[in-house]
Amino acid sequence: MLVGGMGVAGAQAAPHVFFRVQLGSSVAGPVSGRLLVFLKQGKGDKEVNIQEFHPGETWVAAQEVHDLMPGAAVEMDADTVAYPKPFSALPAGEYEVQAVLDTAHTYNYSGRGPEDLVSGVVSLGQWNPGGAEATLTLDQHAEANPMRAQMLDKARAEAKPGELEKVEMESSLLTRFSGNAASIKAWVVLPPGYEKDASAHYPTVYFTHGFGANLDYDLVQGEMIRGRMVTGTMPPMIWVMLDESCAEGTHEFADSVNNGPWGKALTTEFIPMLEKKYRMDARATGRFLNGHSSGGWATLQMEVNYPEVFGGTWSTSPDPSDFHNFTGPDLYAPHANVYHRPDGTDYPIMRMDGKVVATLEQFTKIEAVLGPYGGQITSFDWVFSPRSKSGAPMQMFDHVTGEVNPTVVAYWHDHYDLAHLVEKEWPEKAALLKGRIHLFVGTADTFYLDGSAHLFDARLAKLGADAHFTYIPGRSHFDLYGVGNDRSGLFDQIAAEMYAVARPGVSWKK
């Protein structure tokens, strides 16, 4: 070919790989969404999907589709937006492929669900990229995860008024911010015997989930917590299972220029409403926080920013609380890059059994293909970043190169680096925060979150904050709560410690 019109001969580029994706004739249309095509080596699988613990095994390409009618088709160019490379870079081999239409733009947050349209898995046999064009027909809905569906069905069947109650309140603050009706949602878990003594009031725990979860997850967790109170392994308290999911990921109940005043709405609107409706201890020493992962960071920031409201947080495996270690990279280092260390080696983002299974660069670039909404990296920007001139959050780093934007990091530092905020505000908040921060994390945390926790711990120790940090040997992000054969045993310890603060010297065990 000719390069730049200068008559210089160049190597011929490989032809792009295309797939023909059509909407089944029996599917109601028109439909829109993000069209994803997944491809991997092999044959005979029921599903082809991204495996987060094996990020190089499956290739994925994407494009937006608008108003596709039944029987109509689109030509998917699998080279334009693809991971890990354009599909034309694939070697010849035996492959299988599947198409998914992410109709709700939620793939980055919760994966494929019943609202999404999928094709069957098509075996390409011995396939040469750029050769025969496969046709994929979107003619069925994705199946719900059977284990999750079973747990949710069981929880719904067992949720009874007076035991677990769904509460939703439209927030005037959030509605005014967004211009659309916006609500705070939760499941309220009432302790056994709540209905028998109209004079009894209870300590209250505000729980929030991690990234990828939602109100359905809260129901399942709430049912588990009530069961532990019924059997007597947890003290009688009211638990409010807050939903922090949103279209952009998780809002963390943080006050943000992008997501809105979620913290203010929770503390000035939702909690006062709940305390009128239920017999809760309406005082700081009777309000506690518990959350895991992104929910762990959310509960840390709520305690730091609203210590007059909450009497303590028990946060587990929280997202980074000191940005000198943001799952590894020091965001404040000169010429910081979140993909590569100064020596050029990759920053990992996930480990399993002591081995790196994914790098931060892989994690970010997969998310970018799946869609510019709802992913973990994008979610951080929606919570922490200033707004750009376009109205979207500014990216903390360049998603192609990994180079950090110092201007954005300075904003993150001033508003959301919790270690910095506690140090800055310690003279005013010491009396309220001392002894109230409890943090649990595994020494083998899957996302390296123990690193940031150690830095936060050290800075609180210098302040004399009487913080309580527990590093559980060998535990990862996903088995932290296990005690012996009990996968949720840590809840018992946390709840007992909270109850001792709310009811000093009072025994709750029968």
Model-derived segments and spans:
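Compositionally biased, proline/threonine/alanine/serine-rich low-complexity intrinsically disordered stretches
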Residues: 12-13, 510
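Non-catalytic cap/lid and distal C-terminal segments of serine-dependent acyl enzymes
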Residues: 40-510
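Contiguous beta-strand segments within globular domains
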Residues: 14-23, 28-36, 185-187
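Short linear motifs in intrinsically disordered
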Residues: 10-12, 158
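C-terminal segment of classical bacterial N-terminal signal peptides
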Residues: 2-10
